[in-house]
């Protein structure tokens, strides 16, 4: 049971890291004057439920 909880904990951390990387800029287009692409940063409040779930799992391990 504890190995499953540890796996879920690290999977959640990996998912959060992937969500933070989704705000990268797109590759420049082939046109001579490419328009700049705005970076879409994820909202930090969206991670609240995920952080609560991960902290609950971590507390159950201790």
UniProtKB/Swiss-Prot annotation:
Keywords: Antibiotic, Antimicrobial, Cytolysis, Fungicide, Immunity, Innate immunity, Membrane, Repeat, Secreted, Signal, Target cell membrane, Target membrane, Toxin. It comes from Eumenes pomiformis. It is found in: Secreted; Target cell membrane. This is Venom peptide 6. One of its GO terms (biological process) is defense response to bacterium. Its main location: secreted. Antimicrobial peptide with strong activity against the fungus B.cinerea (MIC=5 uM) and the Gram-positive bacterium S.aureus (MIC=50 uM), and no activity against C.albicans (MIC>200 uM), and the Gram-negative bacterium E.coli (MIC>200 uM). Shows cytolytic activity against insect cell lines. Has no hemolytic activity against human erythrocytes. In vivo, peptide injection in the vicinity of the head and thorax of lepidopteran larvae induces feeding disorder that lasts one or two days before recovering. Not found in venom, suggesting that it is a minor component.
């Amino acid at each position: 049971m504890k190995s499953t909880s540890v796996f879920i904990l690290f999977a959640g951390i990996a998912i959060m890291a992937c969500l933070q990387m989704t705000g990268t800029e797109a590759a420049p287009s082939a046109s001579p004057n490419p328009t700049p692409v705005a970076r879409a940063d994820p909202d930090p409040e969206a991670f609240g439920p995920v952080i609560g779930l991960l902290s609950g799992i971590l507390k159950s391990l201790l």
